[in-house]
Amino acid sequence: NSALRLLTAERAPSGRMPLVADRDLTGVYIHEALGHPCEADLVAAGDSCLDGKLGQKIGSDIVTVVDDPTIRGGYGAYPIDDEGVNTRAKRLITNGVLTEYLNHRETAAHFGIEPNGGARAQDGLHHPLVRMSNTMIMGGNHDTIDDLMEDIDYGIYACGSRGGQVDTGKGSFQFAAQEAWLIENGELTTPLKDVSVSGLTLEILQNVNGLTRDAKLAAPGFCGKGQTVPVGDGGPIMRISEA
């Protein structure tokens, strides 16, 4: 069905407009564009757009993001990190405010705080790095995707990810969606192809203005940062006022 739709799909319109992202694309955005800049080793190295922003409002009021290695069945779950620290859920953003970085013993000492269980190594031959586990944006107060789309006159619904690029220092990103549809007068209409979403992480976080209630982890995956570790990401269906 996807292949057949793409055969007749139209090219996506250019410009800034409302965007509705499914939980797969939402998860990729949260992992890549937000999760990596929250890694304290990147912050300490000056390679994070979130450097110096702890305690500051960086997203809309409805944005709460957690990294939780204790999620039962989560692909990125682990009870104790690779430096022997018990893990716990970390609230990276709480109601739009940046509240915590991911860290390990070295970066915790650098910032004068307690380690929070973010040390992970690919195997015993590698040195532990600050890594994510199961990272997701929490649900909101909309029941269905129809609720998110009903007041959109013209926008795009994008699903999945075919990869992309992120600059953690500048806070910029670009992702290519697997599938997409035009939204017209609150309804899905024309299938689209070659949909690419780009922008600034902090700007997009401020523009999140709708989330469904049903936040879930999406498909499991692996994250590479010189080493490969299993991770989970996801969230609800997310609406962005302008992207």
Enumerate the predicted regions with their spans:
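N-terminal small-residue-enriched
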Residues: 1-243
